[in-house]
Amino acid sequence: MAFTLEDMTEEEFEAFRGMSVQNYAKQNITSGTWTEKEALEKSEQAYENMIPNGRDSSNHYFWNITNVQGERMGWLWLYADPFHPQKEAFIYSFGLYEAFRGKGLAQLALQTLDERARELGAERLALHVFAHNETAVYLYQKMGYAMTNIRMRKQLS
């Protein structure tokens, strides 16, 4: 299936940001990093720090993954760091909507992202994935991503 990466409109970005703030809070609760009480506020602050100018934040790219029929299949958020010594770009967020999952499209989307990142001058890509998201961990490893560090936790009480 062919698809493109299209810039999000301001309205699409605002919807994406809202969804992302909620999801980041949820993932940090699931991982045990934040409590439910503090999660939403911390998530909102993290997004404010990462993209203070919203969609217009420098070197941040917010794309819809769109098929040839014009359907929005998912999203990608990439930061192309012009100052990184190894010319590394960072994938802040990537996902497919439920109807498009499980069809091999994530692999194709990541291959398309590889090309776009190269066009932006990146020589390598990095990302963060929560350990409890085993499906994503498997996908990224299958696509050639290697673990660079592992953070572990032990509950004492």
Spell out what each predicted region is.
Residues F3, D7-E98, R116, M147-L156:
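Acetyl-CoA-dependent GNAT
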Residues M1-F3, L120, G144:
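Extreme N-terminus of proteins, especially the signal/transit-peptide cleavage junction
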Residues A122, A131, Q141-I150:
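Conserved acetyl-CoA-binding loop of GNAT-fold acetyltransferases
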Residues Y97, R101, L127-A136, R153-S157:
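Conserved beta-strand-loop-alpha-helix junction that forms the acyl-donor binding cleft
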